[in-house]
Swiss-Prot record:
Periplasmic side: 39-168
Enzyme class per UniProt: translocase
Gene that specifies this protein: cbaB
Cited InterPro entries: Ba3_CcO_II_C (IPR034214), CcO_II-like_C (IPR002429), Copper_CuA (IPR001505), Cupredoxin (IPR008972), Cyt_c_oxidase_su2_TM_sf (IPR036257), Cyt_c_oxidase_su2a_TM_dom (IPR015209), NosZ/Cyto_c_oxidase_sub2 (IPR051403)
Localization terms from the record: Cell membrane
EC number: 7.1.1.9
Binding site for Cu cation: 114, 149, 153, 157
Family of this protein: Belongs to the cytochrome c oxidase subunit 2 family.
PROSITE patterns per record: COX2, COX2_CUA
Membrane topology: Single-pass membrane protein
Protein name: Cytochrome c oxidase subunit 2
Topology feature Cytoplasmic, residues: 1-3
CDD domains noted in UniProt: ba3_CcO_II_C
UniProt entry keywords in alphabetical sequence: Cell membrane, Copper, Electron transport, Membrane, Metal-binding, Respiratory chain, Translocase, Transmembrane, Transmembrane helix, Transport
């Protein structure tokens, strides 16, 4: 009987150790999640603030209708570029912007999901029909930057390219 009591106490101590370890890990995970939410969600646009357009009429009306008017100067050294991603290209193409200017890209699609990735930069946006994807960037070096679609959008996907020309 005494041996059983000692064995039970040993198992109980072992279980308490694992319980304490599990609770400590739970608190660590909760702290990490709280830290991530507090520090990595800045700048995320809540769903209610999304800009939407009618994908069936986006080519006929609004700022995406006329490629000649797609690059708009909104302030000193600030531009907004309205980009239409469609199967299988980008409009306007090429996009010409000045070096050092703050560029706000507003990208949408009239047909299917596309990607808008500018090589050599951290611009990488998923473009959904009916929604306007917005991204800001300042090109510090002049040159040509290639836009590629990195979201499969159909049989001509591999040929979907565009160009951004950054002028001095």
């Amino acid at each position: 009987m005494v041996d059983e009591h000692k064995a039970h106490k040993a198992i109980l101590a072992y279980e308490k150790g694992w319980l304490a370890f599990s609770l400590a890990m739970l608190f660590v995970f909760i702290a990490l999640i709280a830290y991530t939410l507090a520090t990595h969600t800045a700048g995320v646009i809540p769903a209610g603030k999304l800009e939407r357009v009618d994908p069936t009429t986006v080519r006929q009306e609004g700022p995406w209708a006329d490629p000649a008017q797609a690059v708009v100067q909104t302030g000193p050294n600030q531009y907004t570029v309205y980009v239409l991603a469609f199967a299988f290209g980008y409009q306007p193409n090429p996009i010409e912007v000045p070096q050092g200017a703050e560029i706000v890209f507003k990208i949408t699609s009239p047909d299917v999901i596309h990607g808008f990735h500018v090589e050599g930069t951290n611009i990488n946006v998923e473009v959904l029909p009916g929604e306007v994807s917005t991204v800001r960037y300042t090109f510090k070096r002049p040159g040509e930057y290639r836009i590629i679609c990195n979201q499969y959008c159909g049989l001509g996907h591999q040929n979907m390219f565009g160009t951004i020309v950054v002028k001095e």
